A protein has these predicted regions:
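N-terminal beta1-alpha1 cap of cysteine-dependent amidohydrolase-like domains
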Residues: 2-3, 18-130, 140-148, 152-179
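Bacterial N-terminal signal peptides
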Residues: 7-15
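Conserved G/P- and acidic residue-centered "switch" motifs that form tight phosphate/ATP-binding loops
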Residues: 133
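Cytosolic ligand/metal-binding cores
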Residues: 137
Length: 179
């Protein structure tokens, strides 16, 4: 009888051990995501930040600015996220100051239209969207907000360092959407 219990115990242990999920020999396929940049610039900050979140993820970067609209429409359907990047000034006509372009720097109307399309898609589809610098300003304008056309007239030119180099600067959030 003891031999039978021992044999049964060994049998149960073997059965339970074989039921475990031991797939160490199976390699997982790396996950991939598609991120659309409103306009890729010479800075690698966006890529560096996202790629360091999880280096095992393969990221398919799409530069919306240079992608034909017909192809961009297809790419947007598969996009996992959108980043509205930094860049030139937003046309003041979009926030009610159409005649205030003299105080602005370079304006890119094509980009304003493109980022409107990207935000339309993000809101309709629920695709996550991150705005960085100009991108965040554009999100504000898109949602009905306004801007100061030329910050040095109001504050100081604190967002630029020597020779036009970008610098880190503080931001203050006073109200969130939906708050």
């Amino acid at each position: 009888m003891d031999k039978l219990r021992l044999l049964f115990s060994v049998f149960c242990i073997c059965v339970f051990a074989s039921c475990g999920d031991n797939n160490d020999h199976v390699k997982e396929t790396p996950r991939s995501v598609t991120i659309i940049l409103s306009k890729q610039n010479s800075s690698s900050s966006y890529r560096h930040f996202i790629e360091n979140i999880d280096p095992t993820i393969k990221i398919n970067w799409i530069n919306a600015y240079t992608t034909p609209l017909s192809q961009l429409t297809v790419e947007l359907e598969d996009a996992d996220g959108i980043i509205l990047t930094g860049g030139v000034d937003i046309h003041p006509g979009l926030y009610g100051n159409a005649f205030d372009t003299i105080r602005c720097g370079t304006i890119d109307s094509k980009r304003d239209e493109l980022e409107t399309t990207l935000l339309d898609h993000a809101l309709e589809s629920g695709t996550p969207c991150l705005g960085v610098c100009r991108g965040l300003q554009f999100m504000n304008v898109y949602m009905g907000g306004s801007l100061h056309p030329h910050l040095p007239d109001t504050l100081s030119d604190i967002h630029r360092g020597k020779n036009g180099q970008s610098t880190e600067h503080e931001i203050y959030v006073t109200k969130a959407l939906g708050a």
